[in-house]
Amino acid sequence: MNVQIEESWRQRLQPEFDKDYFRTLTDFVRSEYAHGPVYPPGRLIFNAFNLCPFDQVKVVLIGQDPYHEPGQAQGLCFSVNEGVPFPPSLVNIFKEIKNDIGTDVPTSGSLVRWAQQGILLLNATLTVRAHQAGSHQGRGWETFTDAVIRILADEREHLVFLLWGAYAQRKGNFIDPNRHLLLASPHPSPLSASRGFFGNKHFSRTNEYLRLHGKQPIVW
């Protein structure tokens, strides 16, 4: 499995890599890649970390699974490759950004530019079998990404955690709200966006908090 992880993350996550559950997870993921299409491509499994070193993280956006259709997943939650049509949740994210801060909807659904500005675009599960949503859940990725969130919450201060939907909110339930800003709302999925994702103003609120703590705001 051809994966790399950025050095500042490797230093902090090495204790996780050395645990039995992660070795078991690695064996499972290698077997999956050997026997059929799995997304994202192996070299992009840790893309969220490679594009956003530990000390540069300002915002953490928690997703659930990678996209499971060909050509979509690039190792960043909610993001798709250049030229790929926007999935419905991403359409709604861009719609809320436009309504919140007036930024026009971009031509690309790639959120690499967000990652490069300090947004960790973290899926709870980092791989998925083609055409089978949730197929790699319960194999150990959730334990690993819980550790990522805990390390950030404990070692850093004044981060913004964007928790969209009940799954992400459960994932963030141990974060100290006195140390970080937790912004929770329904998920941007068409099934729930009208129940409180639209109008949540999370993008302007994120930037207000970053400015308050002397950090550069995000160019959404």
Model-based region annotation:
Residues 1-13:
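Generic N-terminal amphipathic, Lys/Arg-enriched alpha-helix
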Residues 3, 15-163, 167-170, 175, ...:
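A polyanion-binding, active-site-adjacent surface
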Residues 197:
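C-terminal substrate-binding/active-site "lid" region of AdoMet-derived donor-dependent transferases
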